[in-house]
Amino acid sequence: MTISDIARMAGVSSAAVSRYLNGGPLSEQKRVVIHEVIKKTGYHPDMAAQTLRTGRVNQVGVIAPSISSHAVGQITAGIVSELDKHRYLMLLGNTDLDERRELGYLNVMQRNHVAGIILMGSFYTPQLAQAFTNCRVPVVVTGQRFPEVPCVYNDDRGAVRELTRRMLDAGRRKIVYISGTEQDQAVGMFRRNGVQDAMNTAGLDGASLPFVSCSAFTMEEGERCMKQLLELYPDLDGVVCVTDLVALGAMRALKAAGRIVGKDVSLAGVGDNWAGSLT
């Protein structure tokens, strides 16, 4: 079974079938007809021949910082859903927040002739900037703002500013923050800036915001950081956390210390995932 056979059965040109297989422009009518023929025949294109012909395969590389993360899982599911519409496969690499793995996957995926790479950004380094410059395929970064490549990101600063404003409106004034590392701009810097912005607007000194940085976005780290903040600031009445899972760990530490969450202390995290529904 060849492209020519599919074209003959669908009543279209071989070029139309090729465009369909490669995610190219095509009328919806032709797309439906070709899809039905391929579905009926069980046709699968020869990937090796396709690579020789185009210099790439219908695969997009996705580099993730931690596949166990709820947010990463949601993003990955969305990517797969969109790739399926265009008949692309996903080649997934998990870095576990290891910069060497990140750089390694960028190289390996290019050698595997992927059509492009989606990098869920974590840390911005000179080595990564150079890798972007040298990359031979399109790269898009999610979750961070890197100058060398197109980026898709949330308004981390604005979101945490609004979250903190609501906490301040509830009367909380002794607010502390459990942060990420400075290397991670989105969660380490922009989210903390959002807390400081809200404090400044409320007439408080945002620059003096007490915070502790967690080394991983886990319950264990949230609990450890919360214990540390309770020792340093026992009269705190509000806690903003870098993620919901960190907030869940912080809640465990607050309860162990006899604090009543929602009554004598407010607690909030960023992420809107399952952890945020637990009290």
What kind of feature is each model-predicted range?
Residues 40, 81-86, 110, 134-141, ...:
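Bacterial carbohydrate/catabolite-sensing allosteric modules
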